[in-house]
Amino acid sequence: MTHQTHAYHMVNPSPWPLTGALSALLMTSGLIMWFHFNSTTLLTLGLTTNMLTMYQWWRDVIRESTFQGHHTPTVQKGLRYGMILFIISEVLFFTGFFWAFYHSSLAPTPELGGCWPPTGIHPLNPLEVPLLNTSVLLASGVSITWAHHSLMEGNRNPMLQALFITIALGIYFTLLQASEYYEAPFTISDGVYGSTFFVATGFHGLHVIIGSTFLIVCFFRQLKFHFTSNHHFGFEAAAWYWHFVDVVWLFLYVSIYWWGS
């Protein structure tokens, strides 16, 4: 921040936007190669470069904020707006899936047998694994709030305990969802029901994995004393994201599992 007359962070030249663009090219080309020629070489290369880019880019952001002090209150305000806009974009992303589901289920076509679930589909019991999954995510919402309040009060150990519980619950949810997919009596190719079910719940599951990874990073950062009671936006963003994942699941449970069955 030397020789600056403003509170903004002037970012140094970085290779990561270029490697990120390259990884996007490799991933999209790799998907085409996988779909048409059953070759995963290019896709694997794209995913690997994408993961390496994300790791190193966020590592640099942590260095700039924690060790170099570039994240002033003004910069943090901008990051908050950015995270809010990102979550709004995710809400609209999931709105598309709910739209597809309700479009198909509220007025089933003759091809579906004129009923919902379509003829021949045996939906999952909403009072079994889906209800347990709901309980797990609601409990994780409580524990992440406990972690946040502990951090704001400067209670390091309770914060670590609560964050560890949240991560464990997130991993447990993922394992339950994987077992449910494995045992489901229908597949993604079983018409519009299978498509909407697996795409909506699958993307939510991916978001749980991303959120769990975000929280694991926060856990290791807290072990290294990166967060203080008044400077912890990295954790706050992870908590916001986790609450978003919670709320989306409640809508999925009520719409697809309970009403849709």
Swiss-Prot record:
Mitochondrial matrix face of the membrane: 1-15, 67-72, 153-155, 224-232
Mitochondrial intermembrane side: 35-40, 106-128, 184-190, 257-261
Keywords, sorted A to Z: Membrane, Mitochondrion, Mitochondrion inner membrane, Translocase, Transmembrane, Transmembrane helix
Function: Component of the cytochrome c oxidase, the last enzyme in the mitochondrial electron transport chain which drives oxidative phosphorylation. The respiratory chain contains 3 multisubunit complexes succinate dehydrogenase (complex II, CII), ubiquinol-cytochrome c oxidoreductase (cytochrome b-c1 complex, complex III, CIII) and cytochrome c oxidase (complex IV, CIV), that cooperate to transfer electrons derived from NADH and succinate to molecular oxygen, creating an electrochemical gradient over the inner membrane that drives transmembrane transport and the ATP synthase.
Record text on subunit structure and interactions: Component of the cytochrome c oxidase (complex IV, CIV), a multisubunit enzyme composed of 14 subunits. The complex is composed of a catalytic core of 3 subunits MT-CO1, MT-CO2 and MT-CO3, encoded in the mitochondrial DNA, and 11 supernumerary subunits COX4I, COX5A, COX5B, COX6A, COX6B, COX6C, COX7A, COX7B, COX7C, COX8 and NDUFA4, which are encoded in the nuclear genome.
Membrane disposition: Multi-pass membrane protein
Domain of life the protein comes from: Eukaryota
GO biological process: mitochondrial electron transport, cytochrome c to oxygen; respiratory chain complex IV assembly
Molecular function via GO: cytochrome-c oxidase activity
Annotated protein name in UniProt: Cytochrome c oxidase subunit 3
SUPFAM superfamilies xref list: Cytochrome c oxidase subunit III-like
Enzyme class: translocase
Similarity field: Belongs to the cytochrome c oxidase subunit 3 family.
GO CC term, one of those recorded: mitochondrial inner membrane
Listed InterPro entries: Cyt_c/ubiquinol_Oxase_su3, Cyt_c_oxase_su3_dom, Cyt_c_oxidase-like_su3, Cyt_c_oxidase_su3-like_sf, Cyt_c_oxidase_su3_a-hlx
Intracellular or extracellular location(s): Mitochondrion inner membrane
EC number assigned by the record: 7.1.1.9
Catalysed transformations (reactions): 4 Fe(II)-[cytochrome c] + O2 + 8 H(+)(in) = 4 Fe(III)-[cytochrome c] + 2 H2O + 4 H(+)(out)
Membrane-crossing residue ranges in chain numbering: 16-34, 41-66, 73-105, 129-152, 156-183, 191-223, 233-256
One protein family per Pfam: COX3
